[in-house]
Amino acid sequence: MTVYAVGDLQGCLEPLKCLLERVAFDPAKDRLWLVGDLVNRGPQSLETLRFLYAMREAVVSVLGNHDLHLLAVAHRSERLKKSDTLREILEAPDREALLDWLRRLPLLHYDEQRQVTLVHAGIPPQWSLEKARLRAAEVEEALRDDQRLPLFLEGMYGNEPAKWDKKLHGIERLRVITNYFTRMRFCTEDGRLDLKSKEGLDTAPPGYAPWFSFASRKTRGEKIIFGHWAALEGQCDEPGLFALDTGCVWGAKMTLLNVDSGERLSCDCAGQQASAKPAGPPA
């Protein structure tokens, strides 16, 4: 069995098919890991979900911010934005099956055999892997609970609280956990988030840095695969970290990583690009 990890899809199905063809992916024996943001802004969000759902036994995916946004819109906790390409999913006859599968995906996946973690945006520097797994489980429980789901989706939007505190409770606690796993790029050493800056490493506000750059980061030594940050262009010099968002939805490329060998392949995404970069959430 070979495990392949692929960066943010965002509804770009053809580049994914291109990559899977190139490695002769066999869902009967291989596994496909996805860093989240399966849908939105690309041309084939519905087809992408259907493709993944059809081979769901071979797919391991974490949730990204765009996936959560889709769930929020579907449950009428949020409205569609002009840049969203989600309407086809919302009007599809199989929407309930697709959305139910989506809501049951984790925020964080840890492979015991390979000792590799899969997450959309990252893990804040002040959390160990053990604590990160526990915090992710809190949000996952809310997503999978029929009664708690609408309340979570309605309250998950927002940039505050900007920093974790173990005394937080209720929706504020779940919101900051969600922001760490699905929206984080820059933060302070103690985990205070800046969610406005979305470009490259040299655009960090004073006192902030990429989440993975701190010497005190408690997940140093862990292998972590992540996406979300297209401006990195797949480059991350930190040992054990693999950045896979290479900007497919902006017309750049989609990247596949052989998790066991470390080999990377990319497929050109010209013609897939969204019309304009977003100015606000769910970035």
UniProtKB/Swiss-Prot annotation:
The keyword Hydrolase is annotated on this UniProt entry:
yes
Instruction: State the source organism's domain of life.
Output: Bacteria
Q: Which UniProt keywords apply?
A: Hydrolase
GO MF assignments: bis(5'-nucleosyl)-tetraphosphatase (symmetrical) activity
- Does Glycosyltransferase appear among the keywords? no
Coiled coil regions, renumbered to chain: none
Taken from the record, one Pfam family name reads Metallophos
In terms of CDD domains, this protein maps to: MPP_ApaH
EC number in record? 3.6.1.41
Catalysed reaction(s) here are:
P(1),P(4)-bis(5'-adenosyl) tetraphosphate + H2O = 2 ADP + 2 H(+)
* Record-linked SUPFAM superfamilies: Metallo-dependent phosphatases
Which HAMAP family does this one have?
ApaH
Query: Which PANTHER family would you find in this protein's record?
Result: CYTOCHROME C5, PTHR40942
Briefly, what is this protein's role?
A: Hydrolyzes diadenosine 5',5'''-P1,P4-tetraphosphate to yield ADP.
Q: Which family does it belong to?
A: Belongs to the Ap4A hydrolase family.
Q: What is this protein called?
A: Bis(5'-nucleosyl)-tetraphosphatase, symmetrical
Designated gene of the protein: apaH
